[in-house]
Amino acid sequence: MEPAAEILVDSPDVVYSPETIEARYEYRTTRVSREGGVLRVQPRATRFTFRTARQVPRLGVMLVGWGGNNGSTLTAAVLANRLRLTWPTRTGRKEANYYGSLTQAGTVNLGLDENGREVFVPFSALLPMVAPNDLVFDGWDISSLNLAEAMRRAQVLDCGLQEQLWPHMESLRPRPSVYIPEFIAANQTARADNLIPGTRAQQLEQIRKDIRDFRSSAGLDKVIVLWTANTERFCEVVPGRNDTAENLLHTIQLGLEVSPSTLFAVASILEDCAFLNGSPQNTLVPGALELASQRHVFVGGDDFKSGQTKVKSVLVDFLIGSGLKTMSIVSYNHLGNNDGQNLSAPLQFRSKEVTKSSVVDDMVHSNHVLYAPGERPDHCVVIKYVPYVGDSKRALDEYTSELMLGGTNTLVLHNTCEDSLLAAPIMLDLVLLTELCQRVSFCTDSDPEPQGFHTVLSLLSFLFKAPLVPPGSPVVNALFRQRSCIENIFRACVGLPPQNHMLLEHKMERPGPGIKPGEVVATSPLPCKKEPTPATNGCTGDANGHPQAPTPKLSTA
């Protein structure tokens, strides 16, 4: 991958220093009030000052479930890219890349060049970001297999790549992890040979020691902890037990019910490490969220949005956005990896069902023309375990929508999702974006005291099926709204306006700034153009707005 050109915003509102990028930014919104039968809309503007630290830290990543399919695949991906590996396959030679990563393979539009052409740059070029090849990995797993053996067990990567990675991954071994049998399926017992002993309080302290040991031994500036282990059953929120930070810490000391993932979350927060939950269970109970707020530590979740659900968050947005009333969504999955085996247990499946079913809620609520209050589509989710297909998950969806005048439209989609190869770049983005957000602060003219983002990092919603948001905030699931949020906030950090896709420069009769008078600019090679077809309605222009002779009147004789 070629390095991106340096971006320098030439504006009096943007100041570059060796330490920071400081940008003045006007945030424009509207406030709507109801007065009788009138909706009164008032434009508003707030002046922000964003400061982004330019110094990129040495970053460590600790994965809970490091020896699983996702953990071993992400580790292999970073090593393969760092070593610039290539390997033969039956369809030709392949080389390591970061396809599927928003930050590494996505682009953003900077604007128009002197010829009126759009200029795109890698997402990672907008702001100083940790290079993925520089990440340092460690983690925990209830299975004692080293990462090379875990990679072979996962059966995700080509043999030619596994052989080259083997000597680099063989020395990587997960630390013992927490195993509480009642939280995951009974079929996971056979893997559980690498466990932290003791009480819940002792296990919590051991996790904290592991984080401190990794930080010091690897010479790290920061550590981020990410849960990519088994889906757990939901944990009941009980007043007096896990509803406040104090109660949750007391519950751990007493050895009462706390899920393994919540133990890891609490340990991470106490060590001032951001914690990200890649599974669907309610790891971040109210007490954990309060603890994160008290210590100003980022948390994010829940459940990686990688395959079927990512497609759903695009497709339903398209259907409802097109004015079609989607009334039935039926989603069927079968997969054969360890995630599928764990989800074959009813309580663990229920956790997944909840996150996969809520993904269309905001799109339905956005259109009261189509949906009456309380009305929503029928939504059914089925997951089955089929060992033979391994990590190659099959997803089948049927969407049925109502059309005008009583018609119906049914769309059926088959999607083969390479589960871990889709999840690994999402994990990468979560870590890189979270770290970058830790270096951003801002203030407003009315509140000049610098602050950071809310500790519930909802900016990461693009990457989660059931995104956590601060109390009272709207939950957004529509994929392109989520992506625009990330892009436009980062544009604000360098003083650029939000991407609005208007392209008014190309829609004016007399071209505006950036377009030479009379010049027609094509953004891509065009095929040979047919001669203009005379209009049948008396219009005197072709489809491109070029004048043409009036349509001759046909003789009626």
UniProtKB/Swiss-Prot annotation:
Annotated signal sequence range = none
Tell me its cofactors.
Answer: NAD(+)
Renumbered to this chain, region (Disordered) spans 512-557
Q: Which Pfam families match?
A: Inos-1-P_synth (PF01658), NAD_binding_5 (PF07994)
Q: Which GO terms describe its biological process?
A: inositol biosynthetic process; phospholipid biosynthetic process
Gene3D superfamilies according to UniProt: NAD(P)-binding Rossmann-like Domain (3.40.50.720)
Q: Where in the cell is it found?
A: Cytoplasm
Tell me the superkingdom of the source. Eukaryota
Any one cellular-component term (Gene Ontology): cytoplasm
Is Lipid biosynthesis a UniProt keyword of this protein?
A: yes
Main function: Key enzyme in myo-inositol biosynthesis pathway that catalyzes the conversion of glucose 6-phosphate to 1-myo-inositol 1-phosphate in a NAD-dependent manner. Rate-limiting enzyme in the synthesis of all inositol-containing compounds.
This chain belongs to the protein called: Inositol-3-phosphate synthase 1
